[in-house]
Amino acid sequence: MTKRGKKPDWRTEGVRIVKASDVDFNTPQTCGMTRAAAINLAKAGAQKLWAGTVSVQPDAKTGAHQHGHLESIIYVVKGRARMRWGERLEYVAEADPGDFIFVPPWVPHQEINARTDEPLECVLVRSDQEPVVVNLDIEPVERPEQVWIDPNHPQG
């Protein structure tokens, strides 16, 4: 039974599959990356989550940005993600395929494709439906401080 007291029609209210060819590129963008929505209210009926893909071309980087009150999880599928964050993007760490990245609310950050020979491909999950993307004008530090994402993965 649902909250409304009637039995759900699992055929129409159950599992949803969004094909890769059906993702929506009409999302707020940041220079240097391509975002596409896969799971949201419009595509799948999701009420509390947003999920999609992010792509950064070889040897490219995004502009600095943050996502307001939203938490973000990034899963690296292909390539090497170099993340910079902080008031002046003064911290840096890298993630490889299979690694997860957590970006807390309000954190200024930048995604960089650390590879010159292949695109960086990631899956992105956010804690809400709101398309919050605040692009920032930040003067980055010259040499960011390196920080480990996971002590099992050496920096490269």
Residue positions per predicted region:
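A short, N-terminal "cap"/entry segment at the start of jelly-roll beta-barrel domains
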Residues: M1-K48, G63, V133-G156
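Conserved short histidine dyad/triad with adjacent acidic residue
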Residues: R35, G52-G68, P105
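Short, charged/polar surface micro-motifs in flexible loops or helix N-caps
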Residues: K43-Q47, Q57-K61, K78-R82, P131
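Short glycine/proline-enriched turns and hinge-like loops at secondary-structure junctions
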Residues: Q47-L49, H67, A95, A114-T116
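Conserved metal-binding segment of the jelly-roll/cupin
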Residues: Q57-D59, W85, A95-R115, V125-S127
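A short beta-strand-loop-beta hairpin characteristic of the jelly-roll/cupin
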Residues: K61, L70-P97
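Short strand-connecting beta-turns/loops that link adjacent beta-strands
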Residues: K43-A44, H69, R88, T116-D117
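A short hydrophobic beta-strand segment most commonly corresponding to one strand
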Residues: T53-V54, I73, F102, D117-V134
